[in-house]
Amino acid sequence: MNRLHVLATGPLVTVQDRGRPGLAHLGVARAGALDAPAAALANRLVGNAPDAAVLEVVLGGLEVRAEAGCWVAVTGAGRAYAGAEWLPAGASLRIGIPATGVCGYLAIAGGIAVPPVLGSRSTDTLAWIGPARVEPGAVLPVGKPNGRPRALDTPRPPRPGPLRVHVGPRADWFADDALERLCATPYVVAADSNRIGLRLDGPALVRRREGELPSEGMVLGAVQVPPSGVPIVFLADHPPTGGYPVLAVVDEADLWQCAQLRPGEEVRFTRSPRGAR
């Protein structure tokens, strides 16, 4: 079995796959790659199954060395195109700081073969379910390759425009024009955003009802509004329950964009056409 030696890391490197959907009733978040299409592309390039585990690399800084020769692919932040590359035995690969975006993905033929927890190899950074964050000195097992690499593949082109949202279950807790104000107002990504949620800076949304809800189930992409009135978009490691009202839900097809937004960048929302999901 091949192994990957971690020589250096940046701000955050974790193992991710498609996550743990369907376990919210047990109090387990979905987790998984923040930019799911980029992770799937990396796997496709090296011949892996779509649910193989990859390394999610926040703002670069990762350097690894493979014990045996292997096919690798890097996608996501700062990558206009991608292709599989052969990494010789003993050679190292370094992912630098991207010029744009946040989350990059490193796939290796055979996938990262850490033991699965609750059906997934993903790290949940809120509950710390799954493997520990990847640190220098870590040695990661690699599975047996079972597919053909692809020399070149074209990532999806960035979809220009705002994040599409659906009306949330607690829209009636807000002023009649709250959703329109959300969609008409530019927000800015806050510095404390992470895998749990995209935190925003901008004007507060006005509520018509006082008090708080009993905790209820939350979904990926929920636009939750805390007492400050400034919305938060729940991402992969969001808590399964929450007590603040949800005004809207971001269309899942657009959530990958949240993985590539840097602090200080502008975010806009728009009402999703009916049936966009």
What kind of feature is each model-predicted range?
Residues M1-R277:
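Conserved "landmark" site that anchors the functional core of diverse proteins
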